[in-house]
Regions:
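Conserved ABC transporter NBD signature motif
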Residues: 73-84, 88-89, 402-410, 417-418
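Conserved ABC ATPase "signature" region
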Residues: 113, 117, 124-142, 442, ...
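Catalytic Walker B motif of ABC-type/P-loop ATPase nucleotide-binding domains
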Residues: 171-175, 500-503
Length: 591
């Protein structure tokens, strides 16, 4: 249903920008977060705010929300200055912060009441508004449930409802799609488009460029500077004619991508199923005229990577010197070894894994195997049972039934010994926020049982590799997101495990950071490391050799990314994406 947006008496002229910033500077001590940017937010549209970690996106949103004062320059929202004129502007602005801004120990209804109190809504107004918002978000059956017990998609809806309590004319969304599955993101877009149709202006900050492509306009920030202001299509057009798809030999997509990145003429190369997407440098197109290179339409991510300097090249220092986890020839991919290694034991094996919580079955007879050098993806909607399966495989949760082994060790009989052979990078990165970077490295080295000499060597190597030296004394919770990710990967790999479990490892990071991360992971597979990953980001799932799709605790599909896409190909959808396959397969089961 559409959500009515009440008109206001002081509506601005139709062409007046919903917000504008002029020569805007915001500094925190010696750190310049925004360096003199000027831009206008068109009314009645969705504007995407993109840029790498530390670009200044959240700072800009907080300035627009009236939560900060600029160091210099000006901010206008709905024709007025935030934090001035009796808070009128803030009353007409809705703000949904990262992680949705919810109080997880309060119920859905209590969260709504808390935000209604902050908006000073009287009893009549909140009764009407609650009824509208609960219908709009489909949360009416869950008003008594604690926010912390909601799925990611339901938390997202509740965060949006809280931001909409004041019937805002400007809605500020700070990475609303992080940590939620494609079905939930699609539902969020439906709701936001309805709001825009009713006259609301939306600023949508995102690390996912396919989300930004849906926006009417984008602002691209980097290091506090505005690099681009305009329609996303115009930015994508800058690389038209320079984007190609190269079909890789069977099982060699990772090696093909790495080969492309060694070429001086290549700006970017990423895996897409059994193919590699290649972006050529200007004036180098003639080098890609062979039959193996098929021209394809550009996308925003291609232009974004070019504008920020291209993908990082060179060998992964993390993989150098890594002890081989299995008898795997250096550089060979999982599929190349599959025939020769068919008789070898899987490094990860799950058979009939089941976990019940009372009458609720969170995981229902889940089974799969992962061999040395293979990347296996566990995909599914929020609440499908992925994290439960993950925790059982890591020895953190005892199965109700079934068996699991890691690196040849049975988790039911020797969970602690199995945990010593795996690395686990959990959601939110498993770091101890009140410990410093150095203390986190020291702690994880100790719990993994490294000798004093090995600990000294490995910790020093990680500090150099991930450029952590300037942050060693900083508390982990205060690190920028990209450095939290680096530290988490360092802690998970200090002991050179045979198996890596990655639970949404790049959630919320930009494409360049994602490429850096997967550059290391792909290199580790050449050393025989087996990888199991969960992700809600379908472009990332393309890096997997095989995918298991989980829904309501059961594995409903398994195959390569291309095999899953082929299952939903039709005349109406001749070139389905992995997100198309995800949604179609889930909806097919739900029908």
């Amino acid at each position: 249903m559409s959500l009515p947006v009440p008109p206001t008496e002081a509506a601005p002229p139709a062409l007046q920008p919903a917000a504008q910033v002029t020569a805007l500077v915001k500094s925190f001590g010696a750190t310049v977060a925004l360096a003199g940017i000027s831009a206008q937010l068109p009314p009645g549209k969705i504007l995407g705010l993109v840029g790498p970690d530390g670009a200044g996106k959240t700072t800009l949103i907080r300035l627009l929300a009236g939560l900060m004062e600029p160091t210099s320059g000006s901010v206008e929202v709905l024709g007025r200055t935030p934090r001035a004129e009796g808070g009128t502007t803030q009353a007409e602005t809705g703000y949904m912060p990262q992680r949705f801004g919810l109080y997880e120990d309060l119920s859905v209804l209590d969260n709504l009441n808390l935000y209604a109190n902050l908006r000073a809504l009287d009893a009549t107004a909140r009764r009407q508004r609650f009824a509208q918002l609960l219908r709009f978000t489909d949360l009416a059956p869950f008003t008594g449930r604690l926010a912390g017990q909601l799925s990611g998609g339901m938390k997202q809806k509740l965060g949006l409802a809280c931001a909409l309590l004041g019937a805002p004319r400007l809605l500020l969304l700070d990475e609303p799609g992080v940590g939620v599955d494609p079905l939930s993101r699609r539902e969020l877009w439906r709701m936001v488009n309805e709001l825009v149709a009713g006259g609301v202006t939306v600023l949508w900050s995102t690390a996912y460029l396919e989300e930004a492509e849906r926006c009417a306009y984008i602002w691209l920030l980097d290091a506090g500077r505005l690099l681009y202001d305009g329609p996303p299509r115009e930015l994508s057009e800058r690389v038209r004619g320079r984007v190609f798809r190269r079909r890789a030999p069977p099982g060699r997509a990772r090696r093909t991508a790495e080969e492309e990145l060694t070429r001086a003429q290549v700006l970017d190369a990423v895996i897409q199923g059994s193919s590699v997407r290649v972006v050529a440098k200007p004036h180098a197109v003639q080098e890609f005229q062979g039959s193996e290179y098929q021209p394809v339409a550009p996308r925003l991510e291609d232009a974004y990577v070019e504008l920020l300097g291209g993908a990082r090249k060179g060998e992964s220092l993390l993989a150098q010197g890594w002890p081989s986890a299995a008898a795997a020839p250096g550089g060979a991919s999982a599929a190349e070894r599959r025939t020769a290694a068919a008789a070898d034991a899987a490094l990860v094996r799950a058979a009939g894994l089941t976990r019940r919580f009372g009458d609720f079955v969170a995981a229902d007879r889940v089974g799969f195997e992962v061999r040395a050098g293979e990347i296996y993806g566990l995909l599914g909607p929020n609440g499908a049972g992925k994290s439960t399966t993950f925790r059982m495989l890591c020895g953190l949760l005892k199965p109700t039934a079934g068996e699991a082994s890691v690196a040849g060790v049975n988790l039911l009989h020797a969970a602690s010994r199995a945990r010593a052979r795996l690395g686990y990078m959990a959601q939110k990165f498993s770091l101890y926020g009140d410990l410093s970077v150095a203390q986190n490295l020291d702690y994880f080295a100790d719990i993994y049982g490294l000798t004093r000499a090995a600990k000294r060597e490995r910790v020093a190597a990680m500090i150099e590799l991930f450029e952590l030296a300037p942050h060693l004394r900083a508390n982990a919770r205060l690190l920028p997101l990209g450095f939290k990710q680096r530290l988490a990967l360092a802690c998970a790999t200090l002991h050179a495990p045979a198996v890596l479990f990655l639970d949404e490892p790049t959630s919320g990071v930009d494409p360049l950071m994602r490429r850096d991360f997967w550059h290391h992971i792909n290199a580790l597979t050449t050393r025989g490391v087996a990888v199991v990953v969960t992700t809600h980001f379908m472009e990332e799932a393309e890096y997997c050799d095989r995918i298991g799709l989980i829904w309501r605790g059961r594995k409903i599909a398994e195959g390569t990314p291309d095999e899953l896409k082929s299952r939903v190909r039709s005349a109406q959808r001749p070139e389905p994406t992995l997100e198309d396959a995800f949604i179609a397969l889930i909806e097919g089961e739900a029908a």
